[in-house]
Amino acid sequence: MDPKVIIKNPTFDSSDNNPDLIKVKNVDFFYKGNKRALFNISMKIKEHTVTAFIGSSGSGKSTLLRLFNRMNDVEPKSIFKGEILINGKNIYSPETDIVKLRTDIGMVFQKPSPFPMSIYDNVAYGPRNQGVRDRKLVNSIVVENLKRAALWDEVKDNLRDSAFALSGGQQQRLCIARAIAMKPKILLMDEPTSALDPISTSKIEELITQLKKDFTIVLVTHHMQQAARVADYTAFFAKGKLIEYNKTKIIFSRPANKKTEDYITGRFE
C-alpha cells in the first residue's frame, strides 16, 4: 500500500442515517478469572448494516461476538466488565431475560449445525417452541424463511428429507433459515463460510447482503476479501484490543493504524 494515501487520523465515518443498535462500553473479558481476552472495548454498531470483525486467531473477535448474546456465560469463572447495550438496554443487567435475548439475537456457527430432523422441522422448530401451533401459519413461516435463505427452490420437493442429506452449503443456508424464522433483531455469524466451497461461500455472501434489509448482521471472518465484499463497517482486532473501526472502504483503502495496514496487506499475522 502506498503510504502517501494513508490518512493517519480519519474520524469514524457514520454518515449513513442508520441508528446505533448495539453500544459496547469499556468492555473487558477474562476467561477462568485471569486470562484476559478483551481490553477496554468500546464501539457502536448501526442497525441494518453488516459489521465484520477481522483479525488473527486469538484476537478477541469471536469472544466479543459471543458476548452479544451472552454465550460466554457458560465459561467457568469468566469475568465480564463494562456494558453492552442493545436498543438502549444493558444486556448484562440482572433483569435481563436470557431466553428472550437469545431469541432476539440469532447465531450461525462456523460449522453447519442442522438439527437431526427433516428440513421442514428444522425451520419449524423455533416457532413451534414459541407456541405456534396453527399448521398453516407454521407452513407459511417455513416457506417464507427458506425463500429468504435462498434455499426454497432447491428443497421444496424434499422438505421431509433429513437435513443431513443436504450439502454443506445448503445446510448452512438451512441454519440461517432456522435462525431468521425466530424474527431476531440481530444475526451473529461466526465464520459462516470457512467450511464451505467457493460457490457455496458466494451464495452465503449474497444472502448476507440481502438479509441486512431486515436484520443487523455482525460477522466474524478470517477472510479479509469477504469483509471487503459484504461489510459496511469493519473492526480490526489484535491481541484482545480493538485496533481500528470504520467504514469498510476506509479500513481497506486508507487505514489509520500501521497494524491495520500490515494486517490487510499480509505483513502481519
Swiss-Prot record:
InterPro entries: AAA+_ATPase, ABC_transporter-like_ATP-bd, ABC_transporter-like_CS, P-loop_NTPase, PstB-like. GO terms for cellular component: plasma membrane. Gene3D superfamilies: P-loop containing nucleotide triphosphate hydrolases. Keywords: ATP-binding, Cell membrane, Membrane, Nucleotide-binding, Phosphate transport, Translocase, Transport. ATP binds at residues 55-62. It is found in: Cell membrane. It comes from the Bacteria. SUPFAM superfamilies: P-loop containing nucleoside triphosphate hydrolases (SSF52540). It is a peripheral membrane protein. It is an enzyme of class 7 (translocase). It catalyses: phosphate(out) + ATP + H2O = ADP + 2 phosphate(in) + H(+). Belongs to the ABC transporter superfamily. Phosphate importer (TC 3.A.1.7) family. The complex is composed of two ATP-binding proteins (PstB), two transmembrane proteins (PstC and PstA) and a solute-binding protein (PstS). PANTHER family: ABC TRANSPORTER I FAMILY MEMBER 17. This is Phosphate import ATP-binding protein PstB.
